[in-house]
């Protein structure tokens, strides 16, 4: 299997499977002399870690990260810093239950990558889905924590803005509420509703989709390049690469199709440090290049395909059958996708910042 690496100058390669011994990543291209410890990474991993509420998978993984290379204690300052060499990170798997998947060893789960992996490679890891499992995203979050160090001065935050058909009230958006509920929801009232709503989904053995919004502030104007290195193009590709993501939009996205030219244009006036925009329908990117406004992206996460409802499928021999999935699964995997989305946006911004410096200096 190839294509486990993304990025150009800030490059991330992930490895490992859901039920393997460990998962991990190698971050190449991180500049030297950036202070970095395992604690800097662990905080982000703890936000994504499973088993923290009844609304996520009950798989219990500590997700303790180990830095294997790429750092050393500076001989003069005594601070551990990056050396500019590849940074290898490892996270051990400790709570696999592969026996839960023995009944589906020869059956394809509808809506899952079971069939397509086997169609391509002639083999698939039925134990938790292997590389197609959301377990792989822990490594992205670890890499994203390093990327945040590279883009110091920029702030990347995410929020769950919709579960099923139920959207938050944007007039009640409060970033401080994100850490007060298990949904990363900025709307206090909607978070309470989501608790009751997801309890019903969870108890029925079903699952539901969600929409996540990522906002990056402090992004300077000028990141990205036409035509095939557009910032929004790379953001879309990075977010689409997250397991279970089926749609991405930047700024107003698909809603812009309903607007007139007068409504959609982000008008400008003279500001203290260049143009001051009167709106941000473009999501902080025009012509593939950042405008200096907040970069805004949203992505849709499909419902978890592993549910308790019997479904029609076929087996590996081509016969019709039914499948009933056991194991521990997220009733709404979109919840834990919030820190994953943040990480991917941070990695893309780090990559584009380094590319921008290489092209125009600064």
Swiss-Prot record:
Name of the top EC class for this enzyme: lyase
Cofactor stoichiometry and binding remark: Reduced FMN (FMNH(2)).
Known EC number: 4.2.3.5
HAMAP family: Chorismate_synth (MF_00300)
Record's subunit section: Homotetramer.
Catalytic activity: 5-O-(1-carboxyvinyl)-3-phosphoshikimate = chorismate + phosphate
One Gene Ontology cellular component annotation held by this UniProt entry: cytosol
UniProt-annotated binding residues for FMN: 131-133, 243-244, 287, 302-306, 328
Keyword Aminoacyl-tRNA synthetase: no
Function: This reaction introduces a second double bond into the aromatic ring system.
Natural source organism: Rhodopseudomonas palustris (strain TIE-1)
GO molecular function terms listed in the Swiss-Prot or TrEMBL record: chorismate synthase activity; FMN binding
Pathway the protein contributes to: Metabolic intermediate biosynthesis; chorismate biosynthesis; chorismate from D-erythrose 4-phosphate and phosphoenolpyruvate: step 7/7
Protein name in UniProt: Chorismate synthase
NCBIfam families: aroC, PRK05382.1
GO BP field: amino acid biosynthetic process; aromatic amino acid family biosynthetic process; chorismate biosynthetic process
Protein family: Belongs to the chorismate synthase family.
Keywords carried by this UniProt record: Amino-acid biosynthesis, Aromatic amino acid biosynthesis, FAD, Flavoprotein, FMN, Lyase, NADP
InterPro entries: Chorismate_synth, Chorismate_synth_AroC_sf, Chorismate_synthase_CS
List of residues binding NADP(+): 48, 54
Listed Pfam families: Chorismate_synt (PF01264)
Cofactor entry: FMNH2
